[in-house]
């Protein structure tokens, strides 16, 4: 309204005061929201209705090119904190890439190895006494894991648990493997043996475990380190493996990291002073909406604590708003399609607003996105655990908007 700045939404001959433009957009999903200026006099005799405005939603939503694409979630002593922005300034977030980490979920005795390259967490099975620190070059570090919140640990999907296994765990170990593919069956190979595939220069390209009389299992350097009482391995040229189609064994992880990743994990070093302590962080970049990139990094603890309270830490024009555990750049937000990662499940579409809430887009998200100026192709497909870092807020859908003001 000219002269006053008041805003109204017209519906069915009634003017409704507008608490936020977002709700008004959702109330006109088909026609798109149009704005006109009018004088107070011209609106004098038009009936007034209830104020419209879903609670805890942004006044307006960002255009597609202002949607956030960078996430950083750090686990600190006080709990995890997540920063979301179109860009995270390197000066304010001085992160350093980590190879791996030894962690323990808060409130649990379970320990995990988190590997950056694999992007997974691996349960360390301590129920078997043979799993000594020496097996994977932990030395004594397994006794000093970094305690993290379960929600933060859930950002890393689970891999095959790490546990030692023995020659005697293999059924029929030592028996001839007479049905192996190709010429391998004529080499006197027995079940339980490790076969190395070597190139013309004598370099080992792949290793396999003979799991039964006809099948091989992929066998990497970590599997070799965890294999107890193994018989001597045999080497064969690459051409002898051309008919091999590896299978899986329940006690050997084909997703295990290489043994080199275990040499220098991040761990809890209580001898560090406050100035040198770091925190573990997970990083996500959704520039490619279909294939986000993930990373494991560390950041100085002092800076992480400062950034969790610093309203200007993202250098955003409006200044971000903060809630319990998230800082979202003001005027931005993240449009997400949350998935379980397992396939066969429809994505859940949500919007993370600069108020620090995760808003469902309702039962028909395409209609909600259309009303707000977005399309499904602009939503980043990310694991559900990332969305669940953010506390839920009001649903942002035409149905929720109409219900909030009693408009049918």
Predicted regions located by residue number:
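Short, surface-exposed polybasic-aromatic patches that bind anionic ligands, especially phosphate groups
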Residues: 1-408
